[in-house]
Design a protein with these regions (language model features):
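Short glycine/proline- and aromatic-enriched beta-strand/turn motifs that initiate or cap beta-hairpins
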Residues: 22-93, 177, 190, 243-249
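Predominantly the C-terminal beta-signal and adjacent terminal strand-loop region
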Residues: 201-249
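Extracellular/periplasm-exposed beta-strand and loop segments of Gram-negative cell-envelope proteins
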Residues: 43-69, 89-116, 143-165, 193, ...
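Cleavable N-terminal export/targeting peptides
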Residues: 1-30, 249
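Surface-exposed extracellular loop regions of Gram-negative outer-membrane beta-barrel proteins
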Residues: 169-187
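Residues on the lipid-exposed face of transmembrane beta-strands in outer-membrane beta-barrel proteins
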Residues: 35-37, 74-80, 120-124, 137-139, ...
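Transmembrane beta-strand segments that form the barrel wall of outer-membrane beta-barrel proteins
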Residues: 182-196, 221-222
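Repeated loop/turn-to-beta-strand initiation elements of outer-membrane beta-barrel proteins
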Residues: 82-85, 130-133, 180-184, 212-215
Length: 249
């Protein structure tokens, strides 16, 4: 039974995960801006269901890439003194099918799914030139559209639905600069509201090839449990992220 899912998405909250030494004290009094396009090579596991039809999901990175029809993601950040505001946005669309057995009959199950995740956050930073701790609060907006089409010799059914909800989140991001051109970031958040629960965690390592750019690699987990009114989306995404941060000067 071929499994389907959603891929290369949420990022919800990579928020310039490898930005350069942002733990430094800002003495200029000016806003500093960064943007980070990135690619999340994620796997997906859990359950997706629309109406009476549900599918277990257990996808590796290669499976998700095969199913991905379109995806785009990126983040932006602004800092002034000890204050920070940031936003992360992800859109992905997947489609796949598989052969299944229905009480002695052979049929097919096709799923098309699109997802948008947008997460604005704001917070306060404490630290010095070597380390920094961001205390963050924000929102995670989800918009999901799923269509499950079951085809078999004697009957066919198609179930589709779209849901949107907002979760409140709180978390932290710890940044450490052990040497001048490298930085380590560890972060986590959790919350809920529109869904039963959501959480994410990631760690990243970045290097600065110039004063304008940081290149980074990270590993990220993002989970959500939404189960309301015959719409089920209980999944965990995890995988490597590759990104490049540009600093405006």
């Amino acid at each position: 039974m071929r499994r389907v899912a959603l891929a290369a998405t949420t990022a919800a909250m990579m928020f310039t995960y490898t930005t350069r030494a942002l733990s430094q004290a800002d003495t200029t009094g000016q806003w500093r801006y960064t943007i980070t396009p990135y690619a999340w090579l994620t796997g997906l596991s859990g359950q997706v269901g629309v109406g009476p039809v549900a599918s277990n999901i257990d996808l590796g990175v290669s499976d998700v890439l095969d199913m991905l029809k379109f995806g785009i993601m990126g983040s932006a950040e602004a800092r002034k003194h000890s204050w920070v505001i940031a936003a992360d946005a992800i859109y992905a669309k997947l489609g796949a099918g598989r052969t299944v057995a229905f009480q002695g009959e052979t049929g097919s199950l096709d799923l098309t799914q699109s997802e948008t995740i947008i997460q604005p956050v704001g917070g306060y930073t404490i630290g010095n030139n070597v380390w920094g701790l961001d205390l963050l609060g924000g929102l995670r907006y989800w918009n999901l559209t799923a269509s499950l089409d079951v085809e078999r010799p004697r009957a066919s059914n198609e179930h589709s639905d779209s849901r949107s909800w907002v979760d409140a989140t709180g978390g932290f991001r710890f940044r450490w600069v052990p040497v001048t051109l490298a930085r380590l970031v560890l972060a986590a958040d959790g919350g809920g509201g529109g869904s039963q629960s959501t959480w994410q965690a990631y760690g990243s390592l970045g290097v600065d090839p110039s004063s304008y750019w940081t290149l980074g690699v990270a590993y990220r987990w993002l989970a959500v449990d939404y189960n309301r009114d015959n719409f089920l989306y209980d999944t965990t995404m995890k995988g490597f992220i590759f990104g490049a941060t540009y600093r405006f000067k």
